[in-house]
């Protein structure tokens, strides 16, 4: 429950989160891992309409689905492992230090300081309160409900939630901030002293070994700015719908020493925020963006002369703004690291400044000199009183928090019901705000019910379902360039297809054809499609398999010789594919075909 403090006076606009008071509309506490979709219609249409354009960030044309990012990251990780190095040998005497500032849009119904809607897909300038555009006489009206997702984020990131926090003004002049200042929590944020743990499964650099702990200095509430679009002749279009949407800024300590680990840190924080329903969407859809602070120092010359967030002995840092993907974080840090090392090797000095990075670039570029605390003229906001957080609400939220990603990953890998590989489990957790994982679990539960009559246990079934969800269904999505939609192929339909396949009622080829038919919009039940199209398996006899295998062997004598003499057994799978081509794909069972080929070739 949330209420205004009963002692509120005009001179002391104090707000309080405590038991009692006015009940908020909607669910305050997550009841399951589906929290990110509570009370909202996250259809594929609305997802595509999410605001992906930010100042200095990539626009919609640069959108890369997360599933493709994950595949690319996995390939690059394997390549780095094969090379046996993380950074070029010429950089071995240089220490890189990185701190990250993450800006995430909170999942709320209203803006931070007005009752205007925080909807992300409405007509431009349709959700604008007087305060949002700084009309004279308008004042901020703090919306206590915005604290709920912010508190979930702080608890999930192991922060010390402060009983009292206050708002400050950060002054700067730019067209996206009509008031001439941004309201934030510079001096007294609502959460401090957090941390996250990154392990090898998170994609950290090889040099970080079994894991690394990254400290979080603070998390602060702040208002977002307008969306700005630059046109020719220095003309700007402004959408004030985004002004005062509630953000949290998560500031890590400068304890990261490799580009890969920095990207892994951002990815891990995003996954945690999504898992507890704190944010609207992730970096891939514009709901999260990152700034990175980069410095280098030469190890052989001792400690540096600079400090940042209490960490001393650092080199002069620069800040790279508005990075809108995990790959951008990694590549921008690499580019800035190389630039700073080159400058220092040439006898130059690094200037503290704000820099930018463009998608596909190998260099950063100067935007402006780096502003400091004095430049921003931070001051307490006189129109807003302190925010007081009741301990009862803190413990209530903590008790209701969903399972966090690391514990969930462990369950998906170790529980025999699922038995997923680490890579597949991680992908399910990270894809589609957790919706893909919910779908997977539903399909597993349905398949277990369908196979109750089988004497064998369900061991391995969860892994099979994971493969179909990620690779077969995921492949259709990628090929069609479509966003995830759990209703396109209902979990019931997928489970029925896998059930028929596991009972040898249909072949693998038939199963894939069934999936494609449902994916393309066939509304018939799986059993009806199988009956109408006569898809039930009519098994080949042993003699028919032998005849097909001998025909394929006659057509591919060189392949047979390589398998027989060089023991290149992996090529048997290719011959199985040839049997399917010359035989009836809906009757050829890959396992039986392989058994016959092995018998004939390796006898």
Swiss-Prot record:
Residues 42-58 have a biased composition (Polar residues). One of its GO terms (cellular component) is glutamyl-tRNA(Gln) amidotransferase complex. Signal peptide: none annotated. PROSITE patterns: GATB. Pfam families: GatB_N, GatB_Yqey. It comes from the Eukaryota. The keyword Mitochondrion applies. GO terms for molecular function: ATP binding; glutaminyl-tRNA synthase (glutamine-hydrolyzing) activity. It is found in: Mitochondrion. It is an enzyme of class 6 (ligase). Transmembrane segments: none annotated. Its EC number is 6.3.5.-. Subunit of the heterotrimeric GatCAB amidotransferase (AdT) complex, composed of A, B and C subunits. This protein may be expected to contain an N-terminal transit peptide but none has been predicted. Allows the formation of correctly charged Gln-tRNA(Gln) through the transamidation of misacylated Glu-tRNA(Gln) in the mitochondria. The reaction takes place in the presence of glutamine and ATP through an activated gamma-phospho-Glu-tRNA(Gln). This is Glutamyl-tRNA(Gln) amidotransferase subunit B, mitochondrial.
